[in-house]
């Protein structure tokens, strides 16, 4: 029996249009993620005894660096789609077509969370060095917001009809319009809603992180600096590794989508690296009984 009534279907990428201006769901979701992250991180920072202005000062730098990093990362691995005849695009402003490099069309989709994590982390390192803050104390109050923001932001993929999985007939299947399907799946209507899987997984990760933070804040649990960040790397990456294997649009190293034949899925490689890094961090903290080195310190010493 086919459970059509449970099939997901995107209403489209635009929430509304007013003259030459349009508001896209993806942009709205990112804005919501930022606002939720600001409030949550500020609350956690206050409970941890950090300066009240810290998150407000950091957030604009972090968001800008993360968005730029997410786009650069994506374009770097999909550069063939942004060269030659595809190099130029245009935007319509007041009935004028203004040419711009297509690589700048971030509102049309095409960002990668791992690029955001890389550039975002670098921005936090430089910020902590500038403000003379302990890197691990700062990032530990941010990772719950990152997980929650990812859970919210993933729904942008739903509205854009992107980042979906292989064909399926499960009750929670996702309908993808013909023009968005890979050619080899052109006659198939329903696919795995990988955006939903990752959104639910990130809520689970957020729940673990916020539970542990609150336990530590009540002195019921000892969480040395960096513990939450390492746990985030492990838990998020475990889910991402599995979900990435279902996607039809992976960034590939030496192969081509939808299955990266003859190559490797980059997100899975990065996930394995992050899991390993997180496990090494946990081992250093709890087995070797050593503090994690502070990357924002000029000589990398522990603080």
From Swiss-Prot:
Q: What is this protein called?
A: Phosphatidylglycerol--prolipoprotein diacylglyceryl transferase
- What GO MF annotations does this protein's record show? phosphatidylglycerol-prolipoprotein diacylglyceryl transferase activity
Q: Which residues cross the membrane?
A: 18-38, 58-78, 106-126, 133-153, 193-213, 223-243, 266-286
Function recorded in the entry = Catalyzes the transfer of the diacylglyceryl group from phosphatidylglycerol to the sulfhydryl group of the N-terminal cysteine of a prolipoprotein, the first step in the formation of mature lipoproteins.
In the record, the note on similarity to other proteins reads: Belongs to the Lgt family.
* Pathway the protein acts in: Protein modification; lipoprotein biosynthesis (diacylglyceryl transfer)
The family database entries (NCBIfam families) matched by this protein are listed as:
lgt
Give the bilayer topology: Multi-pass membrane protein
What's an example GO cellular component term for this entry? plasma membrane
Q: Does the keyword Membrane apply?
A: yes
Which species is this record about? Prochlorococcus marinus (strain NATL2A)
Gene it is expressed from: lgt
Its Enzyme Commission number? 2.5.1.145
A GO biological-process term: lipoprotein biosynthetic process
Q: Which UniProt keywords apply?
A: Cell inner membrane, Cell membrane, Membrane, Transferase, Transmembrane, Transmembrane helix
